[in-house]
């Protein structure tokens, strides 16, 4: 779906067709002797071509230090970090809050606000990826076996990805996305206020944030949150696992054949399924899940056009210019536009 959270397609199947972890390993010694053996783009490169504009826009900014004896430094955005010592056969895709290790990453493509790259047997796509947004979504691999869910973690940050609502096309034909940033910030503000007035020394943290009601509205995989909670070791210390409800371990649905995968994606993109998911996401299907009252608003923020998101949600289609159907899109702003779905996918 256009504007969705990353769609991760796993090349699973029989042993002869499954992507093998051995296909992704590389040797640090080989890397030192022959850089071409590492199928990674260098920092600031897109498919092997250095593009200064893309480096500035997507990959980082250059800052000049106020100290006279210090040179200008580049603040990294998205790039690849090669290990400096022979103690780790891994490469890290770096940016504030994002890290993929230790898989072989290649074919990085930046197009508009979309970032796509191949990660082992996965195709990872970030849509509506805009640098100024505060908040990150990442895929972290802790092992070399891409088929082992225990070694693959999809990391959620409180914003903006956990609050994604959907995409539409504005009057200029540009794709826009609806985000409920206010909802997450309201949760944080409420927790901070409670902590400030509390007689205890407890501090509100991201781990105490409730799960956003639409965090998984567009996720085709399912989530096992219990597998990603912190556990207490015998010494009384908590291990390094993060127990934030925004950090989830994603277990892709098992796919036995490409036919099953094709059918599953067709079912996912079925208009009726999309309407149902959107109704649930916007809270317009009389769901039993409570919606924060403080987030409700009916302020139009975009001009009308021939098709509108409300008519799609209500089953009226995208072409009813004279339709008077209206759907309450609380707790987000009411918008007008066409819901766009991209049926193209790769595996």
From Swiss-Prot:
Residues 282-302 are annotated as: Disordered. InterPro entries: Adhesin_P1_C. Residues 282-300 have a biased composition (Polar residues). Pfam families: Adhesin_P1_C. It comes from the Bacteria. Belongs to the adhesin P1 family. This is Putative adhesin P1-like protein MPN_099. It comes from Mycoplasma pneumoniae (strain ATCC 29342 / M129 / Subtype 1) (Mycoplasmoides pneumoniae). The lineage of its organism: Bacteria, Bacillati, Mycoplasmatota, Mycoplasmoidales, Mycoplasmoidaceae.
């Amino acid at each position: 779906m256009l504007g969705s959270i990353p769609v991760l397609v796993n090349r699973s199947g029989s042993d002869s067709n499954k992507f093998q972890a051995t296909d992704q390993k590389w040797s640090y010694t080989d890397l030192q002797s022959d850089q071409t053996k590492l199928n990674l783009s260098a920092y600031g490169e897109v498919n092997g071509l250095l593009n200064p504009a893309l480096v500035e826009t997507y990959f980082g900014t250059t800052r000049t230090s106020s100290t006279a004896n210090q040179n200008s430094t580049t603040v990294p955005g998205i790039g690849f970090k090669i290990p400096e010592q022979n103690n780790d056969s891994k490469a890290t895709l770096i940016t504030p809050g994002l890290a993929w290790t230790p898989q072989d990453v290649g074919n990085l493509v930046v197009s508009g606000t979309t970032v796509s790259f191949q990660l082992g047997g996965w195709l990872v796509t970030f849509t509506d990826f805009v640098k100024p947004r505060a908040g990150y979504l990442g895929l972290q691999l802790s092992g070399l076996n891409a088929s082992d869910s225990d070694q693959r973690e999809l990391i959620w940050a409180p914003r903006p990805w956990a609050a994604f609502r959907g995409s539409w096309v504005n009057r200029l034909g540009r794709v826009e996305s609806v985000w409920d940033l206010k909802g997450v910030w309201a949760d944080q503000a409420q927790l901070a206020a409670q902590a400030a007035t509390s007689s205890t020394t407890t501090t509100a943290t991201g781990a105490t944030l409730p799960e956003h009601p639409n965090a998984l509205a567009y996720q085709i995989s399912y989530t096992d949150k219990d597998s990603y909670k912190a556990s207490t070791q015998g010494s009384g210390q908590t291990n390094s696992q993060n127990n934030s409800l925004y950090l989830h371990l994603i277990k892709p649905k098992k796919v036995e054949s490409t036919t099953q995968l094709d059918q599953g994606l067709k079912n996912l993109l079925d208009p009726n399924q999309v309407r149902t998911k959107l109704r649930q996401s916007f809270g317009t299907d009389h769901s039993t899940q409570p919606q924060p009252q403080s987030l409700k608003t009916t302020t139009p923020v975009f001009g009308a056009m021939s098709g509108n998101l409300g008519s799609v949600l209500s089953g009226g289609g995208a072409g009813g210019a004279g339709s008077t159907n209206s759907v309450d899109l609380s707790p987000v702003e009411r918008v007008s536009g066409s819901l766009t779905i991209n049926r193209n996918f790769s595996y």
